[in-house]
Amino acid sequence: MEYIQNVVEYYDELYPVTDTQKKFYANIKKSYSMPVKFLQIGCGTGALEHALAQDGSDVTGLEVSKELIAAASLRKRTQLTAVRFFQLSTLDMTRFLGKGFYNVISCLNSRIIFIHDRILLKKFFFDSKVLLSKDGTLVLALFNFHHTEQAAVTQLPELSSIRVKMISSLKKNGTELMYLNQNIETGNGKILKVMDNEEVYPLTKEEIVAFGKDAGYTKFCFYNSFSMDEYTNNSDMLICMMK
């Protein structure tokens, strides 16, 4: 079960747009002519989307949470950039969005793991390929699930700011899926639940390559952060760029 309303106020603090992220995407933009067309899946409150649009890039953000899409839409009213937000599931992307239109599609902050069905995950890779322009790039950022292979319960890296911290854990549930539990602890010690045994799919590097190849992707690059440091199975995070 999800309690997204408990995280909206703190979302930008827990998932800040960093200079490293900006540099990462600035390098990607060099491969395409302006305006670069971005599709951001699981855009949250839209902070990164507005940062991407500062140079005139065309940015579309998708979000399934009504609370987060409301926050993103409110941000749009105060900033004059070429950004649009839609409350839309990945299941419906190809029905409503332009095929072959986007230069870069991103799904960050482990949002892809909430597609907790192998068939629907494969569909995600096929659909993203359909929406990408020729030589377009798909960017994924998620927890490195090689950390979960041995333990029944795995603690994820803590996210924190001055006001709040998020504590997350993954628990095996006896199937191919796992349970994600997340709590927020505020500065005064109050505990707010965000995820309670929410089912997620432990997507690995090997499956990303397999699903990607099936969908027509041929080039895969893996890093352990947006700094583009070399990925290893011991990395906390997995960043993938594929074409």
PLM region spans:
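A short glycine-rich, Lys/Arg-flanked "PGG" loop and its adjoining helix->strand segment in the class I
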Residues: K122-K134
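A short acidic, Gly/Pro-enriched loop at the edge of an enzyme's catalytic core
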Residues: R95-I105
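Class I SAM-dependent methyltransferase SAM/SAH-binding core
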Residues: A47-M93
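A short SAM/SAH-binding and catalytic strip from SAM-dependent methyltransferases
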Residues: N103-I119
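SAM-dependent methyltransferase
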Residues: V139-V209
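C-terminal lobe and adjacent flexible extensions of AdoMet/dcAdoMet transferase-like proteins
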Residues: K205-K243
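Conserved class I S-adenosyl-L-methionine
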Residues: M1-G44
